[in-house]
């Protein structure tokens, strides 16, 4: 799926009603139903404004991953009915132990280095896990161990994720992350206490400050501002997000039901979307899809193009590192804390720690 030199396997399931689920480890990621268009089978991947388009040949399909407006073809894709495995197992090979938590260092093609934490779980030859970075995690990866080599992949509708590596004699691991736009090398060492820097300290200097005044349109065309009566004397959570962002999906899946349970406590949410196009019609389309998917009941507004300069300019932030970034605004309208990045449910105990810290911060602000 990444061209002639590398095929990245993934699994999907179509139920009797035509609903499609992308399968990665324990996750069943629901897409839109199959559409028959002329002689093609189309699987809309609305979350990323993409689609899989296939021609059907007996039990196999061939086609492409492309944008829904047909502006570009991203990758060629083939599919075969009935194959439930991801990576084919080789007979008479023993799987080395890979399971564990690792301190990881990624090296980019530019030479830049980035810290990470890998969380890997193993059952025989079957391997699942994720890589955490300060910007977010790689979500649910699934794969296999063959001898001292391991392979992991993931696909939920954007570009596929692929990691391959090996266990060395000293117990360390080395490998590569390969994508349509990235090719990074990594090395790692087991460390059950491995952790990233505190995400609440990445952008906080300890001083509470006002955001730049903003007035942005919601999905109905209404202008929303933090100074609106609705938000006065309330704790307001402001996620900086995008419908195209996989980690933002995990944040919305948490925030939507959380808001339903906590909105009567004096807390509100304004999600600010920065999207891949500045066209209002496009932004409204993808934001409505996002809203419907997660049953969002709080305000969503469109902030502009998805780049760091736009975020900093529209909100008056001195620095911006990653999507999502979440602002905690106190009852006086000051930014009390900023959480950079996101560690989602695929990260296990790191996600549990995030949930505790999030709720503790909200509880503290509500008591002020």
Predicted regions and their residues:
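Central antiparallel beta-sheet cores of small beta-barrel/beta-sandwich binding domains
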Residues: 2-56, 88, 96-168
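Surface-exposed beta-loop interaction hotspot
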Residues: 73-106, 199-205, 211-214
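N-terminal "domain-start" segment that seeds a small globular fold
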Residues: 191-228
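Conserved redox-active cysteine motifs that mediate thiol-disulfide chemistry
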Residues: 239-257, 261, 278-279
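Thiol-based oxidoreductase modules, predominantly thioredoxin-like and allied folds used
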Residues: 266-283, 295-307
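Short, internal strand/loop/helix patches
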Residues: 287-325
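Thiol-/selenol-based redox modules, centered on thioredoxin-like
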Residues: 322-368
